[in-house]
């Protein structure tokens, strides 16, 4: 459903954000 898509997008965005932070450090 829509909620699962939102959760998947949030999880993906979270992983990308963590990877971005790791690259910055």
Curated annotation (Swiss-Prot):
Function of the molecule: Antibacterial peptide with activity against Gram-positive bacteria S.aureus and E.faecalis, and Gram-negative bacteria P.aeruginosa and E.coli.
TM segment ranges: none
Annotated protein name in UniProt: Dermaseptin-DI5
What the record says about family reads: Belongs to the frog skin active peptide (FSAP) family. Dermaseptin subfamily.
Gene Ontology BP annotations: defense response to bacterium
Annotated Gene Ontology cellular components are: extracellular region
Q: In which tissues is it expressed?
A: Expressed by the skin glands.
Tell me which InterPro entries the record gives.
Dermaseptin_dom (IPR022731)
Where it sits in the cell: the answer is: Secreted
Native source species = Phyllomedusa distincta
Q: Which UniProt keywords apply?
A: Amphibian defense peptide, Antibiotic, Antimicrobial, Secreted
One Pfam match, given by its short name, reads: DD_K
